[in-house]
Amino acid sequence: MASLRDIQGRITSTKKTKQITKAMQMVSAAKLNRAQHNAQSFTPYTDKIREVVAAIASSGTEISHPMLEERPVKKTGYIVVTSDKGLAGGYNSSLIRSLLNTIKERHNSPDEYGIIIMGRIGRDLFKKRGLPIIQEVIGLPDQPEFNDIKNIARTSVEMFADGIFDELYVWYNHFVSPITQDVTEMKLLPLTDIGSDEKATSASASYEYEPNEQAILEKLLPQYAESLIYGSLLDAKASEFGARMTAMSAATDNASALIEELTLKFNRARQAAITQEITEIVGGAAALE
C-alpha cells in the first residue's frame, strides 16, 4: 500500500496538472470565439467572388481558363492543414489517418502526388514516413492573416496552372461544434462545377463586365482559389481550438475525479494509521498493567 507521503504527493501533482489543463481550456475557449468570428466574417467574401465567377461561367459567353478545364490526371496535389501544437484530442490524427488511407487507395507511387503541408505535426509525420512534401509552412499565428499564407496559396494555384498538378485538393477539419470536427476533402481545382451555381443564373444579367468577361475571369479565378485555401485555414483554426478546449475540459474533469479518488484513499490510509497507533498505545498500556 502506498504511504501517506506518496498519496499526498500524487494529490499535489494532480492539482498542479489540473490548474494547467483548466488554464489551457479557458485560453482555447477565448481563441475559439475569435477564430469562429474570423471564419464567419470571411465567408461572404468568398461567396461573392464565387457568385461573380459563376455568373460569367453561366452567361453563355465563350470563355476559357485552365482552372476551369479538366485534364487527364497524372499528378494530384494535396493541401493539408494540421496544427503546430498537440493536446487537441484526435484533431490531427483523424485527419492524417483519413488522408493516408485516401492516398493508399488512389495512388500506386509517390510520383503520382505531392503534399503541401501547413502545421508542424503534419510536416513531421509526413517527413518521418518519407511522403513527398512539395512545400511547407509552420508557425502560423492563432489568428492568421491572408499574408501569412499568401505565398503557399499562390504557389499551389500556379502549380496547377503550370501543369505540375492536374487536380488539387484541400484537406482540413471543418468546424461543426467544439466537440465535433469533420475531416473534409474539398476539391479546389479544377473548378468544374462552378457554372452550376444556382445564384449565378439570376445574377448573371445584373453584371456588366469591363473590359470583358475573359479579363475579369483571369483576375478573379486565382483570387477565388486562394480565398478557398485561406477560408479552409480559418475553419481549421476554429476546429483546432474547439478540439483543444474539449480535450482540456476532459483532462480537467479526469484530474478532478483522480483528486477525489486519491483524497478518499489518503483519508482511509490516515484513518488506518491512526487506528494502528491507538491499537499500539492501548496494547502497550495493557502490557504495563
Swiss-Prot record:
Xref: HAMAP family: ATP_synth_gamma_bact
UniProt protein name: ATP synthase gamma chain
Role of this protein: Produces ATP from ADP in the presence of a proton gradient across the membrane. The gamma chain is believed to be important in regulating ATPase activity and the flow of protons through the CF(0) complex.
Gene responsible for this protein: atpG
Membrane topology: Peripheral membrane protein
Pfam families membership: ATP-synt (PF00231)
Gene3D superfamilies cross-referenced by the UniProt entry: 3.40.1380.10, ATP synthase, gamma subunit, helix hairpin domain (1.10.287.80)
InterPro entries associated with the record: ATP_synth_F1_ATPase_gsu, ATP_synth_F1_gsu, ATP_synth_F1_gsu_CS
SUPFAM superfamilies: ATP synthase (F1-ATPase), gamma subunit
Subunit structure: F-type ATPases have 2 components, CF(1) - the catalytic core - and CF(0) - the membrane proton channel. CF(1) has five subunits: alpha(3), beta(3), gamma(1), delta(1), epsilon(1). CF(0) has three main subunits: a, b and c.
Transmembrane regions listed in the UniProt entry: none
